């Protein structure tokens, strides 16, 4: 009997183990695709920073036949990291179309390439408005290379002045120079969603480092992208780095100094701080906004009416929150606008922060119809914030009009004077008797 009870308990325990595992793995599920599993050791500092922030990492090689992003119409992961630049074919059910569908579904993707870039990453970049240079090419800069460069001038020292001016994306603290070795990119000029996060200097270009230049390079000067980003219209985020070494422990801990005479030497690069900041942004730990309670009413009242009347004085309030360290806190912004729209905006005004919310008072236009209170906030580095509340505005009722309008007094006077004149004329005409003519 005891043996049977032990077997039953053992069976229940086996059933509970997966549930306990799911309960423990409560962080963002992240699939990491690698060229080889040795990258877990050579890039351990970056992966450790993700684990310390609660990410649940699943490491697999990019050609693993069991790979899958979607199962039964549901995404198996929240984030995707591709550290396999040389992959020629993804394994399992993953391909460029699947990754594009993952992005369309709101997933976040971090891609690191290198000079040994394969066709899948090139196609994925094209889907996102990024064009990689050819295989075996590298970014070259004969004026801004590191002292440890082997002679091809492909170990680039990127100045922080070339970073995108967006603290939400690249971090708020000042950084040491960035060490970069990899392939160059250019952005599609017709894609307004692409972000030039880190560009090359004016003396940089992308070409084959072991061949003489016989044609115009693919990317030249400031058009050479070292790191690029994308925030889609559904707030999905993607980052492309032309360098896999950028995320390596060796580059994180390396000293950096330009080979130019008199250049300052730094004991450590700014790669780690920038990599952490980029990962926080792309995985939506930074720059995420949401709309809280929205209220509107006439000034002096507390509840919204069934319909407003033209020229009413109204008050509009909205709560906007920002995700910070896993908690929602009030957002601090001074450029949030409210529009009162029918077809075109009739009123556009700035919202002022009062306590934990933004509010404003304004007078409705002397136009009736169906209007919207609309907040459409779209700023660099932040998710797109949109709020729309529809209301009706009716004309004045008959009893709400003034009995006498001062501007109409002349017309009143003319009407009464005409009536008085007609009355006097009638009296005179009816009661006047003509004198009889005498013979």
From Swiss-Prot:
Leader sequence segment:
1-26
GO CC terms: oligosaccharyltransferase complex
Q: Which cell locations does it reside in? A: Endoplasmic reticulum membrane
Example GO biological process: protein glycosylation
Q: Which domain of life is it from?
A: Eukaryota
Pathway participation: Protein modification; protein glycosylation
Q: What ranges are annotated Lumenal (topological domains)? A: 27-409
Q: Which residues cross the membrane?
A: 410-430
Q: How does it sit in the membrane?
A: Single-pass type I membrane protein
Topological domain (Cytoplasmic) residues are 431-439
UniProt KW keywords? Endoplasmic reticulum, Membrane, Signal, Transmembrane, Transmembrane helix
Oligomeric state and interaction partners are given as:
Component of the oligosaccharyltransferase (OST) complex. OST exists in two different complex forms which contain common core subunits RPN1, RPN2, OST48, OST4, DAD1 and TMEM258, either STT3A or STT3B as catalytic subunits, and form-specific accessory subunits. STT3A complex assembly occurs through the formation of 3 subcomplexes. Subcomplex 1 contains RPN1 and TMEM258, subcomplex 2 contains the STT3A-specific subunits STT3A, DC2/OSTC, and KCP2 as well as the core subunit OST4, and subcomplex 3 contains RPN2, DAD1, and OST48.
Indicate the family of this protein: Belongs to the DDOST 48 kDa subunit family.
Q: What does this protein do?
A: Subunit of the oligosaccharyl transferase (OST) complex that catalyzes the initial transfer of a defined glycan (Glc(3)Man(9)GlcNAc(2) in eukaryotes) from the lipid carrier dolichol-pyrophosphate to an asparagine residue within an Asn-X-Ser/Thr consensus motif in nascent polypeptide chains, the first step in protein N-glycosylation. N-glycosylation occurs cotranslationally and the complex associates with the Sec61 complex at the channel-forming translocon complex that mediates protein translocation across the endoplasmic reticulum (ER). All subunits are required for a maximal enzyme activity.
What protein name applies here? Dolichyl-diphosphooligosaccharide--protein glycosyltransferase 48 kDa subunit
Q: State the organism named in the record.
A: Bos taurus
């Amino acid at each position: 009997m005891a043996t049977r009870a032990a077997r039953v308990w053992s069976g229940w325990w086996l059933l509970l183990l997966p549930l306990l595992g799911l309960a423990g793995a409560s962080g963002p599920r992240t699939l990491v695709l690698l060229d080889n599993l040795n990258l877990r050791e050579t890039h351990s500092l970056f992966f450790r920073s993700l684990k310390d922030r609660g990410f649940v990492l699943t490491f697999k090689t990019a050609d693993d036949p069991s790979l899958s992003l979607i199962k039964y119409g549901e995404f198996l992961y929240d984030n995707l990291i591709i550290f396999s630049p040389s992959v020629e074919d993804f394994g399992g059910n993953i391909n460029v179309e699947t990754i594009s569908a993952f992005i369309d579904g709101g997933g976040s993707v971090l891609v690191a390439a290198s000079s040994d870039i394969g066709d899948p990453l090139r196609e994925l970049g094209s889907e996102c408005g990024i064009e990689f240079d050819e295989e075996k090419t590298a970014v070259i800069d004969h004026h801004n290379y590191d002292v440890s460069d082997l002679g091809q001038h492909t170990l680039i020292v990127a100045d922080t002045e070339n970073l995108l001016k967006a603290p939400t994306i690249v971090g708020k603290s000042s950084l040491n120079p960035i060490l970069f070795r990899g392939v160059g990119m250019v952005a599609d000029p017709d894609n307004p969603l692409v972000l030039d996060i880190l560009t090359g200097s004016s003396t940089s270009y992308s070409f084959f480092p072991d061949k003489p230049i016989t044609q115009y390079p693919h990317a030249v000067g400031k058009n050479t992208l070292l790191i690029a980003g994308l925030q889609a219209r559904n707030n999905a985020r993607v980052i492309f780095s032309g360098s896999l070494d950028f995320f390596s422990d060796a580059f994180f801990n390396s000293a950096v100094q330009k080979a130019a005479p008199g250049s300052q030497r730094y004991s450590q690069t700014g790669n780690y701080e920038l990599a952490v900041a980029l990962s926080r942004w792309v995985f939506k730990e930074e720059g995420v906004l949401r709309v809280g309670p929205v209220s509107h009413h006439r000034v002096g009242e507390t509840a919204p009416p069934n319909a407003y009347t033209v020229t009413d004085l109204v008050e509009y309030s909205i709560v906007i929150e920002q995700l910070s360290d896993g908690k929602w806190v009030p957002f601090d912004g001074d450029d949030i606008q409210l529009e009162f729209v029918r077809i075109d905006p009739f009123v556009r005004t700035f919202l002022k922060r009062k306590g934990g919310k933004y509010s404003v008072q304004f007078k409705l236009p002397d136009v009736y119809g169906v209007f919207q209170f609309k907040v459409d906030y779209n700023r660099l580095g932040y998710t797109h914030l949109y709020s729309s509340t529809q209301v009706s505005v009716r004309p004045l009722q008959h009893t709400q009009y003034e009995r006498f309008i001062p501007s109409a007094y002349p017309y009143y006077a003319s009407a009464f004077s005409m009536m008085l004149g007609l009355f006097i004329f009638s009296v005179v005409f009816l009661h006047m008797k003509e004198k009889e003519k005498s013979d």
